[in-house]
Amino acid sequence: PDDLLAVVYHMIASQLGRVRFAAICRSWRAAAHCAPPVPALPLLLLSPRDCSGTKAHLHCPEDGAVVPLRLPRKAVIKCIVGCHDGGWVASSLPDPFRIVNLFSGAEVPLNKKQAIISCTSRYHGSGQVQILKVVFSGPPKSGECILAALTYNCGIALCRVGCPNTGWSVEGCPNKPIVDILFWNGELYSLLYDGHLIKFEIGMNEDGAPVITATHWLVIHRIGRHQRGILQGLC
C-alpha cells in the first residue's frame, strides 16, 4: 500500500538510502516522489582529491557512507568558498569567481564585474579582494539571488546574480573583524570577533545592485566565564 511505502520512506535516515529506495521500481519511485521532503544533513565533500581534480568522495554524516563522485570537467575547482542546495558551489580558485554544479557541470553565467571583487580602499591599496566565504540568499539560478561574500580585509561584498550590468558592491573595511555571515529567512547576519551579532538591511541602488542600507546591532545573551567553565565541564 502507498501509505505503508510512505511510512517506510520516512524511516530511511540517509539521502543515499532514499535514492536507492526510489530506484527499486516504479511504484516505490512514485511513493518517494509524492512524499514531502525529508530534512537531511548536507553531504560533505572530502579532501584531498586526485591530482586531476575530476575525482572526489562525498561523505554522508547520517549513515557514514562514502560515495565516489566524478566531477564534470567544467566543475574542476580548487577552492570552495560557499555552497547551496542541489550541488551548487562557489569557487574562488582558479580565477575568476565561479558558481558551478558539482553533479551536472552547469555554471551560473556571471559578467566580468561579477567574476572579480575589487576594492578601492585607501587603507590597504586597490586590487582584487580575497574571498573567505560566500552565502546565497536563494537558489543561484534565480534572478533574485543575492550573494554575500566575506572578504579577507574589506568586510562584506554584495552581488545580485540577475543583474547583468552590475558587479560587487564592497561595503567598507570594518574596524572589528567579521567571523561569519549567514542568510536566515532572507535577512543577512554577521558575527563579529568580539561576539556581537549584526543584522543588515539590503536595498538596491539606482543600477539595481544590492547595497546595505541599514545596520542593526542585536542584543544577545553572553556566556560569562563562570558559565563557560560549567559548560566545558559538562562536555
Question: Model regions: which residues?
Answer:
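N-terminal Skp1-binding subsegment of the F-box domain
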Residues: 1-23, 27
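Beta-strand-rich domains and repeat architectures in extracellular enzymes and scaffolds
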Residues: 15, 19, 33-54, 73-87
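Acidic/polar N-terminal loop/beta-strand segments that form early-domain functional surfaces
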Residues: 11, 24, 47-49, 61, ...
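A short helix->beta-strand "capping" segment at the edge of beta-propeller domains
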Residues: 58-75
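N-terminal, well-ordered alpha-helical segments
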Residues: 6, 26-30, 54-56, 65-67, ...
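A sequence/structural signal of beta-propeller blade repeats
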Residues: 73-235
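Short, surface-exposed loop and linker segments with low hydrophobicity and enrichment for Pro/Ser/Thr
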Residues: 1-3, 32-43, 135-144
